[in-house]
Amino acid sequence: MTTIKQENNHMLSVCIITKNEEHNIARCLKSFQKTGFELIVADTGSTDQTKKIAAEYTENIYDFPWCDDFSAAKNFAVSKAAHPYVMVIDSDEYLQQIDRVQLEKMIAEHPGEVGRIRRINIISGKDGKQENKEWINRIFAKESFHYTGRIHEQVTA
């Protein structure tokens, strides 16, 4: 079993909602392990090993009864964050790299704005793998923003 070590020495909490993602959750959480960011996992009813695997990376695992509302689940996860800024990601996503100096500079210079991250979607098809790159809103001050919309949720003030 991996020893849980979260330094919580940065101003950011990473919030993740999940359900039955035992094949993805370790890669997701491990990708943030060296950042020192707080990790928050809101589980919406896993029946596989997702929560057990997540417990190897964080003690901050919360149950959220699924109510057919992605915004409600994400807002619940954000409410558990100890830090003023959050990054919200899905459990099948992972961090490739992060420039903490640039992140902290962005937050300091634009405290009332939403930060965007570049997501690379890898789509497998009969023609092989294709990449779709897009910028999405994922970093924000938890006291100023929240999610709205049951499906295709969006960050709003």
Functional labels for PLM-detected ranges:
Residues 16-35:
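Short, well-formed alpha-helical segments that are part of the catalytic scaffolds
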Residues 10-11, 72-78, 84, 89, ...:
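Catalytic-site signature of metal-activated, phosphate-bearing donor transferases
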